[in-house]
């Protein structure tokens, strides 16, 4: 797919916001994509700590409750393409139930994905939409191979791979291509050398990590 000259919306969390990079204008993955494809503009809608689904109880940091499903209405509908990259905060500290594929309410994680994809398909008709899943993380005492140990998590919480698979499966329902960064990014912060070289803390990527993400997204776009 050729997207030269496109204006692209990027909806995401702290990684899309640029936490971890030294120069957001040049090092952040969305701006790298802008340069790689000679885009006309990128609109960055990244807010750290935010989740796809609604939070059941108010967070200690109100900013974290600005969920994707609420913010999607504020995006520029004249954009030529939309990229959504999120889900890791739902895994890390979201208290919404996981739910099941086919849920339509943003009160569950699975329902939040459905809600977002449905809204985007209706409001960006015939425009490319791409979702990116969370990559692997090893953040403090939280290991993506296991359920998050954050105090907010409820009984039906799952390891990160379940959140990844829910995004992929819902993408298939809507015909929305999904880039699986969990499997295909090729970076695993469980390896100490990889963690130091590409992340600042096992979750947020540094400049080199954002270059990795941009190249993965570039290849994915070109394959469509």
Can you say where each PLM-predicted feature lies in the sequence?
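Conserved SGNH/GDSL esterase-like catalytic core that processes O-acyl groups on lipids
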Residues: 2, 7-9, 15-107, 111
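Short hydrophobic segments within beta-strands
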Residues: 11-12, 132
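Conserved G/P- and acidic residue-centered "switch" motifs that form tight phosphate/ATP-binding loops
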Residues: 12-13, 206
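Alpha-helical cap/lid subdomain in secreted, periplasmic
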Residues: 66-224
């Amino acid at each position: 797919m050729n997207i030269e000259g496109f204006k692209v919306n990027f909806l995401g969390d702290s990684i899309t916001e640029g936490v971890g990079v030294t120069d957001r204008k040049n090092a952040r993955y969305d701006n790298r994509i802008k340069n790689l494809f000679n885009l006309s503009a990128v609109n960055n809608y990244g807010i750290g700590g935010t989740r796809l689904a609604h939070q059941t109880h108010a967070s200690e940091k109100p900013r974290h409750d600005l969920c994707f499903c609420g913010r999607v209405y504020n995006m520029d509908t004249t954009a030529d393409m939309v990229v959504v990259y999120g889900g890791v905060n739902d895994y890390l500290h979201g208290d919404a139930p996981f739910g099941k594929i086919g849920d339509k309410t943003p009160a569950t994680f699975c329902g939040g994905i459905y809600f977002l994809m449905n809204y985007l398909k209706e409001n960006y008709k015939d425009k490319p939409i791409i979702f990116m899943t969370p990559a692997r993380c090893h953040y403090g005492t939280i290991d993506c191979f296991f359920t998050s140990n954050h105090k907010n998590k409820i009984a039906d919480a799952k390891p990160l791979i379940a959140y990844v698979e829910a995004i992929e499966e819902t993408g298939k329902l809507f015909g929305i291509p999904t880039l699986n960064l969990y499997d295909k990014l090729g970076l695993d912060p469980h390896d100490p050398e990889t963690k130091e070289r590409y992340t600042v803390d096992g979750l947020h990527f540094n400049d080199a990590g954002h270059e990795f993400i941009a190249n993965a997204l570039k290849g994915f776009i070109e394959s469509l």
